[in-house]
Amino acid sequence: MLSFQHVLKALLGHELGGLDFRLTDAAIDSRLVSESGLFIALHGDRTDGHLYVDDAFAKGASLALIDHPIKSAYPILDLNSVELQIPDKPPFSLLTDNSLLALQKLAAYWRSRFDIKVIGITGSVGKSSTKELTANVLSKRLVTLKNAGNMNNEIGLPLTLLKLTDEHEVAVLEMGFYVPGEIKLLCDIAHPQIGIITNVGTVHAERAGSIEVIAEGKSE
């Protein structure tokens, strides 16, 4: 199970020793945080997760990732500080340079700890149904992790990977594409050994620019 020291290893490159505690789950919505979970404060179009850090702690979260100073009733550990003074006990926040990048780094680190097959699925249409079908077939014989719903982007895929446990034998991950470079980012995080492209169409052409750009992006 993910722990505080794992988070430090992912973000700093090393553990600090001393205090450690398990993190049961990860969430970006303070209303959905689990007891002893990890809350990642992200900047959204309508609101800012940093406004709800203390709400997440009140719900039972043990740790939060933030990327700018906030008013909080709980300690804040600045990871850029020369002398890191870890609080005596949770809950508290970790101040990072970018909370989204911190989530992605943590997910990539956590994925690297597991020697399992990862299947990445993308395509203009049909990727969700292909993911569900593939996961359903594999789950008959193997303990399978898959994205829930459409958690297939730079936020949802990392959150999915943080659910990996020693019991999982394969992961089936849907990967969404909106702009060039996005599939590469998701692959750098998940490191799939098998890739499936369902098809290439003009979906999201208004963002990508052309079907040629979409085809190139899907091939990343």
Q: What do these predicted regions represent?
A:
Residues 2-120, 129-140, 162:
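Short, basic phosphate-binding NTP loop
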